[in-house]
């Protein structure tokens, strides 16, 4: 894998609501494992939902570790629904990520409050 362009991602998950006892719960724990392994192909899959529950401070954490985050996942908290249904200020967060020049992927991993189509309505303002 060292000579490959493949990236292997590790994802911290919250142990407070979704998976009690999960072994990897913070961004720093993931970074420590990556450092211990010492392979340039290892990165963090940063799940905004899980890290809001475990750490808060999403914007500074993303900024500090941007080079190690090639993929983010999103859902609002609480409830794990689409952006705009909970406590995360996604307008601010997306603007911040954009200003940082993020070139990675952002995936949606949430349970729509109603239908899938309605659950994608939040994205319209970002596609203009």
What label would you give each PLM region?
Residues 7-12:
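Short beta-strand segments at enzyme active-site cores
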């Amino acid at each position: 894998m060292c000579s490959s362009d493949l990236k292997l991602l590790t994802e911290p998950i919250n142990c407070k609501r979704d998976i009690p006892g999960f072994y990897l719960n913070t961004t720093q724990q993931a970074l420590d494992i990556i450092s211990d392994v010492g392979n340039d192909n290892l990165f963090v899959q940063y799940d905004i939902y899980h890290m809001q529950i475990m750490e808060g401070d999403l914007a500074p954490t993303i900024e500090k570790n941007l080079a190690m985050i090639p993929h983010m996942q999103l859902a609002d908290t609480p409830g794990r629904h689409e952006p705009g249904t909970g406590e995360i200020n996604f307008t601010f967060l997306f603007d911040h990520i954009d200003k940082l020049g993020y070139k990675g992927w952002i995936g949606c991993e949430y349970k729509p409050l109603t239908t899938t189509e309605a659950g994608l309505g939040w994205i319209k303002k970002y596609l203009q």
